[in-house]
């Protein structure tokens, strides 16, 4: 059986959501009376590790229940408006990530496109990154290591041989797959 841990505490329940675009989050229960705080690692024995930040939670009856979000947790914060002139998308992203206390992933795509005039309205860091990603035709997400990735989406080719569809039979299944 695979075991998940956060620090020295065993994870007794974990629902992790990995959106194609955005910040991953984990709703967890830990077998501990000591509440985790700040940056934590969700570790799968013999498997991956996710680096995130505790954003809410509490202890009840010897069990901590809470939410962990990918990265430093700053993309949910409201950032002040900013105006740019003769900048690049890299400049805009760097400011968003600095203001949100986040870090760019080493595998991020090319953000060298010019942004002659760019306005970042007051809003969350996630919304600001979404605007840049839209302008560049990129996707964005927080990776397992906590870094923020923006880049061109690439997916492996899928052939019909890779897909298995259940076939129903009988009169109730007529016209259905």
Regions of interest found by a model, annotated:
Residues 177:
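Short, glycine/charged-rich beta-strand-loop motifs at protein surfaces that mediate ligand recognition
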Residues 63-65, 70-73, 104-174:
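Short beta-strand-centered interaction patches in the first periplasmic/extracellular domains
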Residues 83-87, 91, 123-127:
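Soluble non-cytosolic domains of exported or imported proteins
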Residues 44, 82-87, 163-169:
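Short intrinsically disordered coil segments
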Residues 1-81:
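Assembly/oligomerization scaffold segments
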Residues 86-105:
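Glycine-rich, acidic and aromatic/proline-enriched surface loops and short helix-turn segments
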Residues 78-86, 116-119:
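Second-shell loop/turn segments in exported
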């Amino acid at each position: 059986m695979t075991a998940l841990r956060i620090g020295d505490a065993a994870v007794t329940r974990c629902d992790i959501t990995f959106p194609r675009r955005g910040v991953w989050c984990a709703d967890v229960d830990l077998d501990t009376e000591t509440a985790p705080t700040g940056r934590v690692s969700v570790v799968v024995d013999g498997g991956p590790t996710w680096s995130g930040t505790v954003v809410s939670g509490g202890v009840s009856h010897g069990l901590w229940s809470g939410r962990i979000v990918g990265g430093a947790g700053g993309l949910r914060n409201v950032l002040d408006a900013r105006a740019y002139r003769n900048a690049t998308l890299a400049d805009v992203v760097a400011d968003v990530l600095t203001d949100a206390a986040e870090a760019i992933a080493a595998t991020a795509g090319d953000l060298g496109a010019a942004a002659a005039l760019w306005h970042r309205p007051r809003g969350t860091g996630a919304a600001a990154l979404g605007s840049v990603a839209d302008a560049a035709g990129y996707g964005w997400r927080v990776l397992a290591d906590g870094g923020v990735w923006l880049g061109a989406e690439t997916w492996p080719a899928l052939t019909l041989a890779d897909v298995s569809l259940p076939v129903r039979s009988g009169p109730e299944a007529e016209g259905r797959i």
